[in-house]
A protein has these predicted regions:
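Nucleotide-activated chemistry modules centered on ATP-dependent adenylation/adenylyltransferase
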Residues: 1-190
C-alpha cells in the first residue's frame, strides 16, 4: 500500500467488494500504529441490497478487529442516477459522496481501485458492449492516478487517494489470506 498521509478525518469508499474491504483492513492496521486519532468514516453507494449488506459486514468486521481506532459512521446512499443529467455513475457518486463529506468536514477519500489484469481476449469480448469501461480498464492496467481532486457541483472540494493502485486482485486476496481475514473473502461480493 502507498504510504498514507495523516488526515484529521478520512472517508473510505466501501463497495462491498474485496478490494475496498482489503483497503479498510490495511488502513485500520496502519492507523493502529500511526494515526489513532484520525476519524474514520465509510460510505457505500448501492443499487442492490447485497452490496450494502456486504459493505456493512466489512465495516463491522474491521471495526471489531481494530476497535481502538476512532471509528465514526458508515454512510450509505442509493446510487441510482439520471443518465441524462450525469454522464456516468462516477460523476453521480462524486455528487452524492460530497454531501456527506461536507456535513462532516471531510476532505479526503480512500478508494480501493486496483490494477486490471484481464487478458486481451477478455477485453475484446467486452469491447462492443462496454467500450467506455474497456478503455478505462486498458488505462488502469498501466497507470492509475493515485491522487485526484474533485470539485462537485455543490463546490465541496475533496481529494480521492488510491493507496492500493499498485495491487492486482490476486495481490489483494493474498494480503487478506496472509492476515487471516478470510471472512472478508467469503462475505464480499467480488
Amino acid at each position: 500500500m502507498h504510504k498514507l498521509d495523516s488526515f484529521d478525518r478520512v472517508l473510505v469508499s466501501l463497495s462491498g467488494g474485496i478490494d475496498s474491504a482489503a483497503l479498510l483492513y490495511m488502513v485500520a492496521k496502519q492507523y493502529t500504529i500511526t494515526h489513532r486519532t484520525t476519524e474514520i468514516y465509510a460510505i457505500t453507494g448501492y443499487g442492490k441490497p447485497d452490496t450494502l449488506e456486504a459493505a456493512k459486514f466489512v465495516w463491522g468486521y474491521v471495526k471489531n478487529k481494530f476497535g481502538r481506532l476512532n471509528w465514526k459512521t458508515h454512510f450509505d446512499y442509493d446510487n441510482y442516477y439520471d443518465k441524462s443529467y450525469y454522464s456516468h455513475r462516477g460523476k453521480a457518486d462524486h455528487e452524492h459522496r460530497s454531501i456527506f463529506m461536507e456535513e462532516h468536514n471531510i476532505k479526503d477519500v480512500l478508494h480501493g481501485r486496483v490494477k486490471t489484469t484481464l487478458t486481451e481476449e477478455q477485453l475484446k469480448q467486452c469491447e462492443t458492449q462496454y467500450p467506455q469501461a474497456v478503455s478505462k480498464l486498458l488505462l488502469n492496467s498501466h497507470v492509475i492516478e493515485t491522487k485526484k481532486t474533485y470539485m462537485p457541483q455543490n463546490r465541496w472540494e475533496y481529494t480521492i487517494h488510491r493507496p492500493i493502485s499498485n495491487y492486482t486482485k490476486s495481490m489483494v486476496v493474498d494480503y487478506i489470506k496472509e492476515h487471516n481475514a478470510n471472512e472478508l473473502l467469503t462475505e464480499t461480493i467480488s
